[in-house]
Swiss-Prot record:
This is Type 4 apparatus protein DotM. NCBIfam families: DotM_IcmP_IVB. It is found in: Cell inner membrane. It comes from Legionella pneumophila subsp. pneumophila (strain Philadelphia 1 / ATCC 33152 / DSM 7513). Component of the Dot/Icm type IVB secretion system (T4BSS), which is used to inject bacterial effector proteins into eukaryotic host cells. Part of a subcomplex which recruits effector proteins and delivers them to the core transmembrane subcomplex. Forms the interacting surface for recruitment of acidic Glu-rich motif-containing effectors. InterPro entries: DotM-like, DotM_C. GO terms for biological process: protein transport. GO terms for cellular component: plasma membrane. Exhibits patches of positively charged residues, which form binding sites for acidic Glu-rich peptides. It is a multi-pass membrane protein. Changing L208R: Abolishes intracellular growth in A.castellanii. The T4BSS is a complex nanomachine composed of several subcomplexes. This subunit is part of the Type IV Coupling Complex (T4CC), a subcomplex composed of the DotLMNYZ core and the IcmSW-LvgA adapter subunits, linked by the C-terminal tail of DotL. Six DotLMNYZ hetero-pentameric units may assemble into a hexameric nanomachine, forming an inner membrane channel for effectors to pass through. Interacts directly with DotL. The chain crosses the membrane at residues 18-38, 99-119.
Amino acid sequence: MYIEMAQQQQQSGSDNSMAPVWIVILLFITAYFVWALAHQYIVSFVFTINIWQARLVNLFLNNQLLANQIYLMQTLDPNTVNWDQMVTVMRAVGDYMRYPVICILVVLAFVLYNSNVTLKYRKTYDMKSLRAQEQFNWPAIMPIVKEDLVSQDVNKGPWAMALTPMEFARKYNLLRKDDALLDNPVPGEEMTAGIRRGDAKRVFTMQLGPYWDGFERCSPQAYALSAVFMARMNRDRDAANNILKVLDKTFVDGKPDFSVARPVMKKYQNSELVQEVVAKHAYVLTVIASLLEAAREDGVVPSSEFLWLKPVDRRLWYMLNCVGRQTPYSEVAGPFAHWKAEKEMGRRSLVPMIDEAIRALEIAVKEVRLTPRQMEELEP
């Protein structure tokens, strides 16, 4: 049984090997019958195409031989034209058509050569030259085009990265011994530090900044960004983009033109949407954070669109950068916690509500293990 099945499979395999041959034979037979049955229609169609080609060429050549070929194709009965005669007429017209076709192909080759991506993009860029070119397409990067941030210390200067919770606690001397040191500590044993809650409350309260007293009392950068957010809240993207574009360009010159925001501010500061936001917050930072949040109902408003703000007003930058995050940076944990509390209550609060910021800092510090030597450096 197994031998018979194997023989059948071999036989079917050999039969399949002849399939291309049979397909070619079938195509020839089909072509023959099509020519035999539809001979006059094929000749008529081919002659029609060649007549139009010949007429087009003869408009420029005015050649009598070509005119004769046109007359011949128009007067011949398709039923009397055989295959050889049709090919002869097509070749005669083709002798004239080859030249315009060659010209067209040369033009297309030239176009294809110039549109080739590999040949078009032959200039090599490094990061400096690329950002220098792209700053006109992306004006938001203008403030950092001349900066060499890669070679700078990420923990120093106006462009320094945000402090981690432990770095923040060390900077403001908020750490204290939380675990009692053992009389005979085990070598390599790790412990955790605690937070001076009173000092932490003072630091986070100071982060809140000034009370809200109207847009005219805001800093120039807060005033300008408020106008941007108001414009987006009222679906005026052109005005918002214009303010940001002007600020990007003028910041590079060292003199940011914040006055560009004044017309937009006057137009929208008394609108119902803006006044509804302002009425629910007591601090400048919390008001502007809610303006940004409301502006995002019109679409994306990333903090990367106002990079110039970071070296100008670091606290406002990080406050706006944290809008939309679940967890803020320690540098703005106080105003962020207060902002969340005001949003939850639906009204303004002059009393700092920063307990959640203190609790979050404690949790973050507890996650960092310290060696006994590091613990000894801390005060109780």
